[in-house]
Amino acid sequence: MKLRWFAFLVVILAGCSSKQDYRNPPWNAEVPVKRAMQWMPISEKAGAAWGVDPHLITAIIAIESGGNPNAVSKSNAIGLMQLKASTSGRDVYRRMGWRGEPTTSELKNPERNISMGAAYLSILENGPLAGIKDPQVMQYALVVSYANGAGALLRTFSSDRKKAIEKINDLDADEFFEHVVDNHPAPQAPRYIWKLQQALDAM
């Protein structure tokens, strides 16, 4: 009986320890933020055009590319804000009334990349995330959706978008973050929020 109880305890502890610590590996925001800040004039211009906080744009640049306009990820996300031509890039083109998707050279252009990144954040805020009332919760929801998709986030609350937004509005920023830690299927989702806060604090 004791052996059976010990085995059960080991399974429980293993389950608890399987949740990744979003703070590991460590991330120092100081250098990437400094590099991202060089693009602030463009971020301010794009932010004004699309109604997006330029500090949020700068934080995303720091997190996504460390301020490198030529960065290309393994999944072919490109440029300062690491946009994928076939997904976020196509969404922005559609929003602008254009056909097709941006080219690699277009996404490596700092002004075009930041403009499209700001446009995509606006699409998220005024589309699937519309109705979130708390500004900080909206900011957290934006970065999680930017990285992992709005649908994946909303489904952790409800399969119905309206009900999901209502549940989100019952939470403050800390409670929203804890919900993401406990329920989002992507382990990088809470880490992205944590990195966002680190980046904003470093500005």
Swiss-Prot record:
Gene (UniProt)? emtA
Would you tell me the protein name for this molecule?
A: Endo-type membrane-bound lytic murein transglycosylase A
- Its domain of life reads Bacteria
Presence of keyword Secreted:
no
Name the HAMAP family on file: EmtA (MF_01381)
Q: Which residues are annotated with the lipid modification N-palmitoyl cysteine?
A: C16
Q: Where is the signal peptide?
A: 1-15
Top EC class for this record: lyase
